[in-house]
Amino acid sequence: LNASNIRAYDLRLSNGGVFHQIGTELGLLHHPVDISSFILEPAERIDLVIDFSEYKGQEITLLNDSPAPPSPGTELIMKFKVGNELKYPDTSTIPEELMPFHKIDPALAAKERTLHLDETTDHYGRVLHLLNNKMWDEPATETPALDTIEIWHLVNHFDFPHPIHLHLVHFEILGRKVFTEEDFDEYGNYKFNLESLTPPLDFEKGPKDVVRTEPGQVTSIVMHFKEHCGDYVWHCHILEHEDNDMMRPLRVEA
């Protein structure tokens, strides 16, 4: 879990070792995935296994390579001191199959929404980061019907990432694409072929509720509102942003 208010982490092992990823925010993967590094935005979670049987007697450091300007010491996260002998035999293994995972078919989407991450200023001239240029207390505009599938295109107009978090529902990342003004129609809706997206990174392929929206890119996600109706929220998970109007109501209607 990245519990930082704003800092992202780009994590790897100092010896070049492998992480065996077994899950994302909202569940296990179908099969384990071997990764050498991963990025965690605020509120993102990842489930990992490290096989230390290969590193007998070694000292290994978990390193942070995030390009964000670090405070002193934030590049060194944790040190593992691997012993030479086990007190008891370890017979544990990572299963080849973890949990059946039924992907959401974007072709079944009842609606596509283009949602812009942008900024304005308040009446004192202070910067406000907003979702679709709307304040928190304005009426809900994201109102999916219960048991429907939707695709959301999150358009990040900033020069830095925003971690976008949806309550209630899990989603899958379809992919990302650098956008230009020509990619939008006269109403600001994104128009393109889903096949033109760059696929999500290996550690993002699972059921999620937080996504890193890259600067200058559209990030497309698909979700199925199939279990609950009512009032929820979606927001940027940078604490200073979500507490200053980068949050919107999400109403699932019966």
Where is each model-derived feature located?
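Histidine- and aromatic-rich segments of cupredoxin/plastocyanin-like copper-binding domains
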Residues: L1-P100, D105
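Active-site pocket scaffolds in enzymes
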Residues: H20-S36, L108-A254
